[in-house]
Amino acid sequence: MSATKTLEAVARDRVGKGAARAVRRQGQIPAVIYGGNQAPEAIAVDLIRTRTLIYAGGFKTTLFDITVGGKKTRAIPRDYQLDPVSGVPLHVDFLRVVSGQTVTVDVPVHFVNDEKAPGIKQKGGTLNVALHTVSLDVAPDQIPDAIEVDLTGREIGDVIHASDLRLPAGTYTGEPTDTVANILPPTVLGAEVEAEEAAIAEAQSAEAAEEKAEAEAEATNEKNDTEE
């Protein structure tokens, strides 16, 4: 898993929309640390640092040592809100990490060695990904950075199930038979593309015919009006 990262924060003595806006005007983001059988702690974290961490990826699967007034708390991000227009972070929720605790996280699935898969490299097949992430219920300090799937030797028609993945034992929240990915023959996607292109062409042709008919009708009406 990723190394634990550090994050400096300051305590907030006021909460609510007005207080949150004041925090944001100071270049910070309102946040809260909760859980662990302790009272929630309202904090503020640096906007630029936090935005960088969020957009770097893996934010919600990374452990943080958050320092507030000299006191260090280990926590993991559970949620964050972004401005729908600007994408600027508006708020972050951190969960305290305590001994014996597990958390449910979505871990990305990375596919490697596609150039060593005969079904893709030599036969023109396409990797069809059903699950881009897998949900794991795991101890915070055991969260994988990603789940790697080796495509070496894979042929057209091969199906990769959750049971084929190398996961921490007993952590997957789904079913072993869940399809993660499969390799489709080139004709499957080709037929879909051809059908889609044909449908688009038919729609464009119908639209053009309709516009032509409307133009002819308008021209006829104008001619009749002139003759009258």
From Swiss-Prot:
Keyword Lyase included in the entry's annotation: no
Any single biological process term in GO? translation
Q: Where is the composition biased (Basic and acidic residues)?
A: 209-228
- The question of whether Plastid is a record keyword is answered with no
- Stretches the record annotates as Disordered: 198-228
Q: Which GO terms describe its molecular function?
A: 5S rRNA binding; structural constituent of ribosome
Query: GO CC annotation: what is one?
Result: cytosolic large ribosomal subunit
Q: Which UniProt keywords apply?
A: Ribonucleoprotein, Ribosomal protein, RNA-binding, rRNA-binding
Return any one Pfam family short name: Ribosomal_TL5_C
User: HAMAP family, per this entry?
Assistant: Ribosomal_bL25_CTC
State how it assembles. Part of the 50S ribosomal subunit; part of the 5S rRNA/L5/L18/L25 subcomplex. Contacts the 5S rRNA. Binds to the 5S rRNA independently of L5 and L18.
Give the protein's biological function.
Answer: This is one of the proteins that binds to the 5S RNA in the ribosome where it forms part of the central protuberance.
What protein name applies here? Large ribosomal subunit protein bL25
What is the organism of origin for this protein?
Methylorubrum populi (strain ATCC BAA-705 / NCIMB 13946 / BJ001) (Methylobacterium populi)
Tell me the gene name.
rplY
